[in-house]
Amino acid sequence: MEYFAFQWHITDACDQRCKHCYIFAEDACKQQDAMTWPQMQDTFYNCLDFCEVYHRLPYFYITGGDPILHPSFWDLLGLMKEHHIPFTILGNPFHLNDEVCRRMKEYGCEKYQLSLDGLRQTHDWFRKPGSFDCTLEKIACLKRAGIRAVVMTTVSGTNIDEIPELIDTVVAHKADV
C-alpha cells in the first residue's frame, strides 16, 4: 500500500520572523492562531478515514510556525504513536535538546526538517540572529537521538551564490541531506 502525505500546520507560534514567511508577511500579519486539541483530534481521525477509503497509509509532516510550541504537541505525538503513524517534524532548532530529541524519537519521529537559507550572515538576516549556528548544532542533537536531520533551503537571489558552500557546510555537519 502506498503512503498519502499530509502536511499539517498546527500553529502559527514561532520564535523567528523569517523574511519569506506567509504567517508574518507585512500585508497579511494577523493574530497568531493554533488548532485546539479537539480540532487536532478531529483532523487526525479524518485523515485516517480518508486513507482507509482510498487504501493508503497516512504519513504526516507536522509544521507551523514551530509545532513544538503548540501546547498539545506531545499529545499529538502520543496519538501518532498510539496509531503507529510515521511522521516528520518541520520546525526550528531553538527548543531542541538531547531530552526533547530522545522523546520525539520514542514517539516515532523519523525526520526533523531544519532550514538553512544561506551562510551565517544571510541566514541570520532571513530568520533570526544566532539561528545559523543553532541550526548546525542541533543536527548532531537530532542524530544522537536517531532522528534523521534534513535541511531545507529557500533559494532566492539573495542566497543563490552561497548554495555550493552551504551544501558543503551541511554535509560537513553530517545532515541527512
Residue ranges and their predicted role:
Residues 28, 67-69, 93-98, 112-129, ...:
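Conserved radical SAM core fold
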Residues 104, 108-119, 175-177:
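Non-cysteine beta-strand/loop elements that form the S-adenosyl-L-methionine
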Residues 1-110:
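Conserved alpha-helical substructure of the radical SAM core
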Residues 9, 50-62, 81-88, 110-111, ...:
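Conserved C-terminal portion of the radical SAM core fold
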Residues 102-106, 127-129, 165-168:
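Short low-complexity, flexible loop/linker segments enriched in glycine and/or proline
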Residues 35, 39, 115, 131-134:
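Short acidic-hydrophobic sequence patches enriched in Asp/Glu that either
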Residues 16, 121, 149:
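Glycine-centered loop/turn positions within well-structured domains
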